[in-house]
Amino acid sequence: MELSLTLFVTLDGVYQAPGGPEEDPSGGFTQGGWLAPFVDDEFGAFIGAIFGRAEAFLLGRHTYDIFASYWPKITDSDDVVPVKLNALPKFVVSSHLDHADWAGTEILRGDLLTEITAIKQRPGGEVQV
């Protein structure tokens, strides 16, 4: 498998998923949802194409917590994002997460380089970060 990264970032270095203002206010961040005004059909097609290539996901614990609280509840079979997120393997890097209730989740607790190398040696396509 190969690692693939898609990042939403402003010119001044702010990066955050295209969620709403309340998505992640940690550290006093008040600009959540900055991408929302720019989301249109073309953006949706772009995201659909990216998720269409996914064969697994690599998440940090914080992102996992956000995703796991939302995506398992979304069951639109016509939307590639929840279809892929809910069906494919998810690898979560964490030394604190005790268990993962989201189906298909494996917690990576060992040496990160060793764990990622092992994932990359598996057969398959993209592991999206």
Positions of PLM-derived features:
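Portal/gating segments that form or line small-molecule/metal binding sites
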Residues: 1-128
